[in-house]
Each structure stands twice: as structure tokens, then as C-alpha cells.
């Protein structure tokens, strides 16, 4: 068989861009992602710390993100935080499509001063979260640090990825959380890359994800 006999994947003809609009009685969330972006981010969720973390995903994952959200902030940030995770997860899944040709797996170890966090993920089609953060304070600014886990639970379930988060070191809550989002971004960037050697085939011995 000649090299030319293999199907060629023309990346320019396969834009990996998706938009999802989710409206509930509690929130109104619009997310657009471009998996082959340059790290451009527009985030206005009404939760400043979450916006800051979304910028980390975009910048370090080289994923263009536009996240606009309105929610019942007068109650607390929980519903908006969770629904942003849900909608972003759905947008990622939609942009990935059948996941043909992607590397699929990603792993990254991110330091931020004294904090060190490892993230490993698999766009497997099987949602699972193993969460190993020990965040010492209840809040970073006005952000409830319990919501970090809730964000990733929502993201994992709706993108159908397997995600492992391990904290190896860290005493500053902001540093621990930001290192987590940076590690996630770099691991995701690795996993969503198109592998030209796969020539558009699904990265599974089963032939389906």
C-alpha cells in the first residue's frame, strides 16, 4: 500500500467550532468554542474568579472561548458556575464530534509558585472525575472554593471525558485552583490535537468512542 492510499485529513475543511445555548429557570448561558484557536477569550459569567479561570483554559489550551452567562446571582454563584460547566462541556463534545483523528489522551503537570497540580484526561466517551484537590480556604475573594469541584463535575459529565486531578503540593488556594485550570488546559490541548498518522480514524481499538 502506498502512503497516498491512506485517506488524508484536510484540517482547513473541518472547522472544530461549536455553539451551545442553555436556558433554564435559573440561568441563561451561551458558549462558543473553537478548538483550533489562538487563545482568544471573552468571558462574562458574572463570577469574576470563574472568568479568570476560563481565561486560563483558553490561553493555555489555545481554545477560543466566548462564554456569556446570566444567573440567579442574588441567591449564590452555584447555579451559574455549574451551568457554565455543563454548557462548556456540551460545546466541547459538539466541537469534537465523533472524535476522529484526535490524540484523545492528555497529561500535564503545572506549577504555580508553591502549588503543583497534575491533570490527566481521556476523551473516552465515559464520564468520570477523580478529584484530589485540598483547597485550604472556603473562599478566594467572593468565590466559594467548593464550586471548583462542581464546575469539573458538570464539565466531565457533559463532555463525556475521564478526568483525574491530583494536587502534589500547595498551600495558597488561588495558586492551587489556577494551577489546576492551567494543567487542565494543557492536557486538553494535547488530547484534542489532530494526529495526522490517524488519518481521520477513531482513536480506539473498538472503533468507536
Curated annotation (Swiss-Prot):
Coiled coil: none
Catalytic reactions on record: D-erythro-1-(imidazol-4-yl)glycerol 3-phosphate = 3-(imidazol-4-yl)-2-oxopropyl phosphate + H2O
InterPro entries: IGPD_sf (IPR038494), ImidazoleglycerolP_deHydtase (IPR000807), ImidazoleglycerP_deHydtase_CS (IPR020565), Ribosomal_Su5_D2-typ_SF (IPR020568)
Record's GO cellular component terms: cytoplasm
Entry keyword set: Amino-acid biosynthesis, Cytoplasm, Histidine biosynthesis, Lyase
PROSITE patterns: IGP_DEHYDRATASE_1, IGP_DEHYDRATASE_2
Biological process according to GO: L-histidine biosynthetic process
GO molecular function annotation: imidazoleglycerol-phosphate dehydratase activity
Pathway annotation from the record: Amino-acid biosynthesis; L-histidine biosynthesis; L-histidine from 5-phospho-alpha-D-ribose 1-diphosphate: step 6/9
Record's signal peptide: none
Subcellular location: Cytoplasm
Subcellular location, principal: cytoplasm
Top EC class for this record: lyase
Listed EC numbers: 4.2.1.19
SUPFAM superfamilies the UniProt entry points to: Ribosomal protein S5 domain 2-like
Family per similarity comment: Belongs to the imidazoleglycerol-phosphate dehydratase family.
Record-linked NCBIfam families: PRK00951.1-1, PRK00951.1-3, PRK00951.2-1, PRK00951.2-4
Name under which the protein is recorded: Imidazoleglycerol-phosphate dehydratase
Organism: Nostoc sp. (strain PCC 7120 / SAG 25.82 / UTEX 2576)
Gene name as annotated: hisB
Amino acid at each position: 500500500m502506498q502512503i497516498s492510499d491512506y485517506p488524508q485529513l484536510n484540517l482547513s475543511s473541518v472547522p472544530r467550532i461549536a455553539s451551545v445555548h442553555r436556558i433554564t429557570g435559573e440561568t441563561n448561558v451561551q458558549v462558543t468554542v473553537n478548538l483550533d484557536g489562538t487563545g482568544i477569550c471573552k468571558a462574562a459569567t458574572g463570577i469574576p474568579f470563574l472568568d479568570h479561570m476560563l481565561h486560563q483554559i483558553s490561553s493555555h489550551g489555545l481554545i477560543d472561548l466566548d462564554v456569556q452567562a446570566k444567573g440567579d446571582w442574588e441567591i449564590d454563584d452555584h447555579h451559574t458556575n455549574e451551568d457554565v460547566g455543563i454548557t462548556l462541556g456540551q460545546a466541547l463534545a459538539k466541537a469534537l464530534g465523533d472524535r476522529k483523528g484526535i490524540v484523545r489522551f492528555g497529561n500535564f503537570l503545572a506549577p504555580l509558585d508553591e502549588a503543583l497540580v497534575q491533570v490527566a484526561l481521556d476523551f473516552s466517551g465515559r464520564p468520570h472525575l477523580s478529584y484530589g484537590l485540598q483547597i485550604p480556604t472556603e473562599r478566594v475573594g467572593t468565590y466559594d472554593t467548593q464550586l471548583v469541584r462542581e464546575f469539573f463535575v458538570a464539565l466531565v459529565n457533559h463532555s463525556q471525558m475521564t478526568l483525574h486531578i491530583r494536587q502534589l503540593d500547595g498551600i495558597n488556594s488561588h495558586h492551587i485552583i489556577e494551577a489546576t485550570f492551567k494543567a487542565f488546559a494543557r492536557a486538553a490541548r494535547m488530547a484534542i490535537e489532530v494526529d495526522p498518522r490517524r488519518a481521520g480514524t477513531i482513536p480506539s481499538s473498538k472503533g468507536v468512542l
